[in-house]
UniProtKB/Swiss-Prot annotation:
Keyword tags: Ribonucleoprotein, Ribosomal protein, RNA-binding, rRNA-binding
UniProt free text on domains: The N-terminal domain interacts with the head of the 30S subunit; the C-terminal domain interacts with the body and contacts protein S4. The interaction surface between S4 and S5 is involved in control of translational fidelity.
Ranges of residues in domain S5 DRBM: 12-75
Organism from which the protein derives: Shewanella loihica (strain ATCC BAA-1088 / PV-4)
Protein name as it appears in the record: Small ribosomal subunit protein uS5
Lineage, top ranks: Bacteria, Pseudomonadati, Pseudomonadota, Gammaproteobacteria, Alteromonadales
Length: 167
């Protein structure tokens, strides 16, 4: 039975990062299915990723989009860039990102670029080390963004004011 859902009006940007054909070997031969990796974001500090698998590509993409919408996290940005250099990792993938001046653009590869675009980052320098598997790169990028702290958050944690933190 097919599910019917009204189109969502949440103004999220959606990006398809990767589609992959996978197979399961059974006694009668191979059963093919498709996986899809997607990222969604509002372009203003909210970003999520999802991974879907189905027998047909559109169904896999739809599942991935639904999972991405349920998996949204908030990231605090400043003037379209990061607060400070950050590192993230997931399994064999490591990412490094640092803030960049206005006009630099998003200097990032494939999967990392998609995450940064939908998150609302406009100027950043980044590099991926180790495995460049798109799933791991997306997870490492989101990990790095989540662990980034603003000066106000650090000051509150230390019980100081922002001016004392900045020195």
């Amino acid at each position: 039975m097919a599910k019917f859902e009204a189109p969502q009006k949440d103004d999220l940007q959606e990006k398809l990062v990767a589609v992959n054909r996978v197979s399961k070997v059974v006694k009668g031969g191979r059963i093919f299915s498709f996986t899809a990796l997607t990222v969604v974001g509002d372009g203003n500090g909210k970003v999520g990723y999802g991974y879907g698998k189905a027998r047909e590509v559109p169904a896999a993409i739809q599942k991935a989009m639904e999972k991405a919408r349920r998996n949204i996290v908030s990231v605090e940005l400043v003037n379209g860039t990061l607060h400070h250099p950050v590192k993230g990792r997931h399994t064999g993938s490591r990412v490094y990102m640092q803030p960049a001046s206005e006009g630099t653009g998003i200097i990032a590869g494939g999967a990392m670029r998609a995450v940064l675009e939908v998150a609302g980052v406009h100027n950043v320098l980044s590099k991926a080390y180790g495995s460049t598997n798109p799933i791991n790169i997306v997870r490492a990028t989101v990990d790095a963004l989540v662990h980034m702290k603003s000066p106000a958050q650090i000051a509150a944690k230390r019980g100081l004011n922002v001016d004392e933190i900045r020195g």
